[in-house]
From Swiss-Prot:
Activator of apoptosis, independent of rpr and hid, that acts on the effector Dredd. Keywords: Apoptosis. Residues 23-51 have a biased composition (Low complexity). GO terms for biological process: apoptotic process; apoptotic signaling pathway; determination of adult lifespan; larval central nervous system remodeling; melanization defense response; neuron apoptotic process; positive regulation of apoptotic process; positive regulation of release of cytochrome c from mitochondria. The gene is grim. GO terms for molecular function: protein homodimerization activity. The keyword Cell membrane does not apply. GO terms for cellular component: cytoplasm; mitochondrial matrix; mitochondrion; nucleus; plasma membrane. It comes from the Eukaryota. This is Cell death protein Grim. Signal peptide: none annotated. The keyword Cell membrane does not apply. Interacts with Diap2 (via BIR2 domain). Residues 21-71, 119-138 are annotated as: Disordered.
Amino acid sequence: MAIAYFIPDQAQLLARSYQQNGQQTAASPRTTATAAAPSQQQQQSQQQQQQQRHHHQQQRPQFRANISVPLGSQQGSMTMSEFGCWDLLAQIFCYALRIYSYSSSQRQPTVIQISFEISSGGQNNDEDDVTDATSKEN
């Protein structure tokens, strides 16, 4: 039986922490000196532009979910509905949509990329691998 580990609460907390950091940066007061020299005003405007660029970069939360699906020797006899991989992909996609459409006022075009990797768990598990087609000779 295949088991999938997916922790959506951590993903939601991650997205919210990025959003809260962005709101705190926007809410911080900026003071400017009225009697400052022109060179100081230019430096302050450059610093504000850099802060705005940095703030704009922080508004894009990036989220990565690592999902581990250990497959045993019984996986070959399981049907696709028993394995449930389509259900898992649908849950990941729907949850990603919820995270990125959290604030409808700042909604931007979003590309959601779901990728997966199939690899063996270890190098010494070749004897248990039912898909290994090579013959082993002593």
